[in-house]
């Protein structure tokens, strides 16, 4: 079984790849995966320390399995990297994807971020006094953040590659 963060990311990736009109990349070395996460396998870490102590949980704790599982799921053969940079990890993964495209190192990069709710990030943000004591209310003057979980993925590709295959281009 997978950590919840990885499972969320695989679903987001599947949707992004399908939306892009792509599928299996056949190990193409010009297809890369960059995924970001604040905590990675926080749920597995939590399970391990709460008494489960299953050796398999240890392998799901780091951030590295996330991008590895995504790359395996689409058979990407290029760069596979995980970004661990708190709240900005997903955004940084998209910037990194753009850099790979601009540098000519990849034609297609699947990029995004994922995190599952667990006591690990909650405890960290609580110790920083970063959590809002009130419920989430967009467009108000809050005094902190409200944590949640989710994943998002986008397919970033060179203009030439997208144009050549007749892709729907959302932005340039």
Each PLM stretch: what is its role?
Residues 1-31:
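Conserved active-site "lid/cap" helical segment
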Residues 97-117:
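Short glycine/serine-rich loop segments
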Residues 1-11, 40-48, 55-96, 105, ...:
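Conserved catalytic cysteine-centered active-site region
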Residues 15-16, 33, 38-42:
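A short acidic, glycine/proline-enriched capping/turn motif at secondary-structure boundaries
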Residues 37-39, 114-118, 151, 160:
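Glycine-rich beta-alpha junction loops
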Residues 135-172:
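Condensing-enzyme catalytic core mediating Claisen C-C bond formation in acyl metabolism
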